[in-house]
């Protein structure tokens, strides 16, 4: 009886300690975050985005312009927000400029075309203390079928190479911890910068995602589906070479199974139809299939090791954080 009572008291004491710790950890508020709008010729949407942000209670707004040739800058300045001209090319230059310029502990990036809902910002702030990056996973209602298909392929490819489980790596709305973001080394130039940031944050920090709304954009779309999709895939391959090279090269070598199997099927068809047995082609096909099988095994092992490494890193970081 005494033992049970002591055990119960111990549990209550632990619970009170947890409550006290939670009280001391101040939540992230609107004063702790700067909303960053990278823009290029967004005169049709930037004013609506700024109004939407302010309507939801956020006043720290930074517009980073990529040398617009329309009235984007004038429209943003007329709303009384800070407007900077980016250095460096593409969207990457805008993100780097923002990271160097903001003074708040967090920055939240969202496109200036009104596709993202400022009401969702609170979802990011609710988890900001525990993560270096939080990405917004878009609902698919206003995303075209072709874009959904491409995004699904890109996400699957990204997750396989990096060892993660994200549902939207191409999203244009995400929160960054400024102290962690300043350690990013960004090399991409276009829309693939989001995938590059997420890869580095996943490997070197902590990242998660929250569900967000996605609206029809205001103004003309700049995204050319196939061109930018290819750029993103190319960028992810480059990231794979850096963060998980064994899996990437093994996966590439495993593709040798396709011509190898084709050769063996052709040899079998020729033999069954009385055209003789093609020994040279059969040996070549067998070699390709064997090499591909071994590469697939090595790639699978590399992927398992990478995921184990990520789990260990996560446990270590959580231990350091709690200590």
Identify the meaning behind each predicted range:
Residues 41-55:
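Short, well-formed alpha-helical segments that are part of the catalytic scaffolds
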Residues 65-73:
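A conserved acidic beta->alpha catalytic loop
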Residues 86-89, 93-101, 106, 118-191, ...:
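Acceptor/aglycone-binding surface of glycosyltransferases and processive sugar-polymer synthases
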Residues 2-28, 195-323:
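Hydrophobic helical membrane-anchoring modules
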Residues 34-38, 62:
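Short hydrophobic beta-strand elements that form part
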Residues 42-45, 68, 91:
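Donor nucleotide-sugar binding loop of glycosyltransferases
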Residues 114-115:
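Acidic metal-phosphate-binding loop of nucleotide-sugar-dependent transferases
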